[in-house]
């Protein structure tokens, strides 16, 4: 790369790709070639920069100019102004929301200031389909060092001392997991990379595979050396076509370079990787269900013991780690256990990648040191709540996580603190909610997902969650009672205590955490038949104003349930008992005589007046 004077990096992650970053890349390349600059300026497709809210992203080196929301039509101006004349295109620069000033370098953006990219270190920096660029960024150096300088047990001890824990949700110590697998003798062992990522809205693992697949392949080979495995399998959901494409390319390139396959680097160690495709079932994030799916069986969890490290894929000892966990391994080997363990908290070392979403200004992929607070993530990295709304809650840990309140904003991000607060780390989903969100409806939404994703093997999860969802539906429809609230708490606790796997054991978390933190909303739904956020349609009331209605009958004609009565040129009335809250009457009324109320007492008052 040294022969080029300038490098233009174009984000080619799935998010930017869907916003035509591929056309941006092609237009920039064509424009550079047209100007005869192909020998001086290199156009590179990279992985995700993380700032998905502002994509497509284009970054120009060596001056680190960061352009946002670039369109294909902007390519000529970027080449003419920046590449040729050395002048920034100001209209494409990021604008600081507070100072309203343009920011040239991403290092000075609030979104990036508190991030520390370890697992994402190469995403947005290299072409993931070019192994030479990965090698230039130290890819496979850790594997070479391990194979030539360390024994398997010495390598495991490095991972143990680093304090690396599983990033897939449970947080089990990675070094200990490898040690257990290494102690079980067998004629064949397996290393499995869990790239299924079944959480809705989560894209941490996908982005790593799209942006830096060689870091994962290298880590799998290191793990294979440590536990005595010669075969690796990547279990990836078929819905990740770009990640699959780049991973296939990376595997082929690594084989060509002698970094996978027989006799790696002439050391006598052999290890190869193949891929298995999943259908995206959430339950297959659980390692025994994942293994069953890989074997062509139904994706159902099984009782432990035996653990996969004892009897896993095809009955052989199997080590399962997720993508983010593995991506940390090579850099730990190169920089040392002490370096990694100095980052984070006493029990949670290193960094964590989160998919930041919801009612927040800066939606995207972030990587932060363990111990950073929710407040710092939401207000400094995330840029605060959209449209000046008031913060209400943050849901962490995916669909099985808990909803935390403003009182929890100073909670540090680590496994123990989030669990103590009533939520969990999970794989890294983080959804911010504002004042317009109904917490009862939110709990119902997430529970609806786990009901659909339950494998059905154990009764507490299969039946219990369905009963929970039915009870929440009853409450959001204005038919709930005080007994229903007690039922939610009691049944949720039973499901947590008696379910077979992590899906069932954590599935009641959205319900139990909202009961703990937002009981007033449940009571309003049950006793006042009111949804303060206006999200529960059955608790909304359309009312016709006697002062404004002229009796044109337009609303009456469009009502599908004949809930509106009244004669021509007389005030009309809506029968609340049979109104289905479709809103057709309000859309049809040309005199603004129909209003939508959230409070039933106000409905009675409006009718009486």
Ranges and model annotations:
Residues 1-7, 21-45, 62-91, 142-159, ...:
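Ferredoxin-type iron-sulfur electron-transfer modules in oxidoreductases and energy-metabolism complexes
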Residues 10, 126-129, 134-141, 191-205, ...:
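Gly-rich Lys/Arg/Thr-decorated short loops/hinges at beta-loop-alpha junctions or inter-strand turns
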Residues 16, 139, 159-181, 280-292, ...:
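Conserved phosphate/anionic-ligand binding catalytic regions in large, soluble enzymes, centered on
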Residues 32, 219-221, 370-386:
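Short amphipathic, charge-patterned alpha-helical segments
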Residues 54-58, 460-466, 544, 554-573, ...:
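Iron-sulfur cluster-binding cysteine motifs and their immediate structural context
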Residues 93-162, 314, 321-336:
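Flexible inter-domain linker/hinge segments
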Residues 115, 244-370, 382:
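Hydrophobic alpha-helical positions that pack around
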Residues 350-362, 368, 532-580, 584:
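C-terminal accessory/binding modules appended to enzymatic or scaffolding proteins
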């Amino acid at each position: 790369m040294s022969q080029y004077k300038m490098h233009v990096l174009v984000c080619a992650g799935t998010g930017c790709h869907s916003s035509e970053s591929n056309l941006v890349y092609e237009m920039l390349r064509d424009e550079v070639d047209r100007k005869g600059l192909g020998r001086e300026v290199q156009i590179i497709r990279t992985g995700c920069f993380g700032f998905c809210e502002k994509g497509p992203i284009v970054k120009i080196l060596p001056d680190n100019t960061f352009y946002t929301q670039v369109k294909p039509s902007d390519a000529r101006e970027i080449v003419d102004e920046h590449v040729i004349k050395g002048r920034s295109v100001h209209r494409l620069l990021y604008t600081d929301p507070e100072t309203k000033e343009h920011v040239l370098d991403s290092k000075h953006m609030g979104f990036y200031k508190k991030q520390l990219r370890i697992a994402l270190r190469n995403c947005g920096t290299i072409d993931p389909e070019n192994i030479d660029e990965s090698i230039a960024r130290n890819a496979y150096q850790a594997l070479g060092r391990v194979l030539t300088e360390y024994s398997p047990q010495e390598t495991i001890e490095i991972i143990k001392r680093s304090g690396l824990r599983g990033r897939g949700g449970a947080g089990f110590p990675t070094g200990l997991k490898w040690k257990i697998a290494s102690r079980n003798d067998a004629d064949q062992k397996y290393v499995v990379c869990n790239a299924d990522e079944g959480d809705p809205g989560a894209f941490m693992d996908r982005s790593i595979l799209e942006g830096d697949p060689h870091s994962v392949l290298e880590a799998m080979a290191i793990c294979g050396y440590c536990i005595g495995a010669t075969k690796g399998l990547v279990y990836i959901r078929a819905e990740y076509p770009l990640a699959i494409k780049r991973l296939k390319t990376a595997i082929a390139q690594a084989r060509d370079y002698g970094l996978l396959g027989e006799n790696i680097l002439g050391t006598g160690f052999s290890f190869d990787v193949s891929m298995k495709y999943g259908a995206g079932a959430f339950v297959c994030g659980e390692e025994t269900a994942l293994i069953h799916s890989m074997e062509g069986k139904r994706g159902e969890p099984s009782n432990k013991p035996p653990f996969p490290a004892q009897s896993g894929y095809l009955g052989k000892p199997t080590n399962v780690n997720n993508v983010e966990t593995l991506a940390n391994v090579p850099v730990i080997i190169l920089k040392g256990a002490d370096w990694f363990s100095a980052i984070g908290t006493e029990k949670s070392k290193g960094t964590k990648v989160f998919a930041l979403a919801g009612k927040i200004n800066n939606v995207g992929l972030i990587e932060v040191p363990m111990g950073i607070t929710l407040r710092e993530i939401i207000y400094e990295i995330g840029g605060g709540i959209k449209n000046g709304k008031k913060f209400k809650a943050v849901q962490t840990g995916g669909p099985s996580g808990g909803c935390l309140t403003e009182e929890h904003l100073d909670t540090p991000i680590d496994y123990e603190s989030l669990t103590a607060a009533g939520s969990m780390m999970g794989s890294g989903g983080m959804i911010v909610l504002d004042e317009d969100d109904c917490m009862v409806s939110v709990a119902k939404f997430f529970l609806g997902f786990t009901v659909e994703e339950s494998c059905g093997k154990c009764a507490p999860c299969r039946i219990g969650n369905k009963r929970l969802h039915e009870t929440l539906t009853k409450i959001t429809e204005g038919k709930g009672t005080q007994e229903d609230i007690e039922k939610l708490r009691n049944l949720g606790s039973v499901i947590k205590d008696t379910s077979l796997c992590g899906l069932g054991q954590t599935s009641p978390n959205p319900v139990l955490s909202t009961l703990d933190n937002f009981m007033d909303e449940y009571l309003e739904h049950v006793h006042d038949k009111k949804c303060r956020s206006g999200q529960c349609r059955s608790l909304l009331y359309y009312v016709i104003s006697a002062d404004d209605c002229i009796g044109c009958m337009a609303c009456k004609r469009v009502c599908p349930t004949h809930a509106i009565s009244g004669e021509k040129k007389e005030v009309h009335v809506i029968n609340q008992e049979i109104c289905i809250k479709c809103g057709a009457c309000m859309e049809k009324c040309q005199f603004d005589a129909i209003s939508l109320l959230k409070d039933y007492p106000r409905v009675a008052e409006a009718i009486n007046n």
